[in-house]
Amino acid sequence: MLYDIRLNLRYDYDAAAGGGRHQVRVMPPTISGVQRVIAASLSFAPAPSERSDFSDFFGNNVTSIAFRDAHDALDIRMSARVAVSRPEPGLDVSPDIRRLREELDAVRSLSPGSPHHFLAASDHAGIDAAITAYARGSAGSSAVSTAVDLCNRIHRDFTYDGEATTVQTRASDAFDLRRGVCQDFSHIMIAGLRGLGIPAGYVSGFLRTIPPRGKPRLEGADAMHAWVKVWCGRDTGWQEFDPTNGMRASNDHITVGHGRDYSDVAPIVGVLKTTGGQVGEQAVDVIPVVLEKA
């Protein structure tokens, strides 16, 4: 699938900010065998006093910006054309949890893609006894079957509610509520798998939404999204699952970044020199591109 993606993040401040410094993670990367970025651009208004681009430890695209002059708003616009072609899942040859731990012990690398980075508790996805007990009900004959079942159960057992949680909500709190959004469901799945000894990480990106039959597609109605990557052994490697929708990641999922939890891939983090609050808005368009045949 070929997509044109447009993202607009806007923050309006109650009082003018005298300065600020931020890190922005919204630019999709090229990922071998998954997606290819054909073109991309990122702009800011007002223009920052300083700007630099780099890759973080996990290989995510980061733009660092700083402002020295007073400003009462920040407007961020990203556009990209991305081709997505995820491989079809093959025959499940992943080991069971016991053998997975043996394979994990044999991994000596601490490179960014090493499963060891995704096994311990993290800020948003701590190891929690209640979540581990819930996840144990999905433990199957293989790592993949365990992940599939847990993904489907979270989709079935939890209610999507955009008012129930915030970006600061931890997996244990969302689990108690039995409601939340994609970030919460991903953190719950990550915490549950880690509790079973299965490495799992957080993926941020975009998801194309399809309007109801007969309804027009609305501008800005698509969304930034979150899902889960799971290490399923030496031969199977990393697989991705979307517990919000009870499915594997598909060609409608466009990756922006990945990490241990939301805090590693938040779209924007930083500090402001100001005395008031702020209001943020987000608009996303994920538009399929149909190329005319020659």
Specify the residue positions occupied by each region the protein language model found.
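Short low-complexity stretches enriched in small and charged residues
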Residues: M1, P28-A39, H155-F158, Q183-H187, ...
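Intrinsically disordered, low-complexity N-terminal segments that are enriched in acidic
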Residues: M1-L104
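Generic structural "secondary-structure junction" signal
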Residues: A15, G19, V26-P28, F44-P46, ...
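Glycine-rich, small/acidic residue-mixed loop/short-helix segments
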Residues: R25-Q35, A40-L42, N245-A266, G270-V279, ...
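Glycine-rich, flexible loop/turn motifs
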Residues: E50, F54, A106, T166, ...
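Hydrophobic/aromatic-rich core segments of domains that either
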Residues: N152, D184-G276
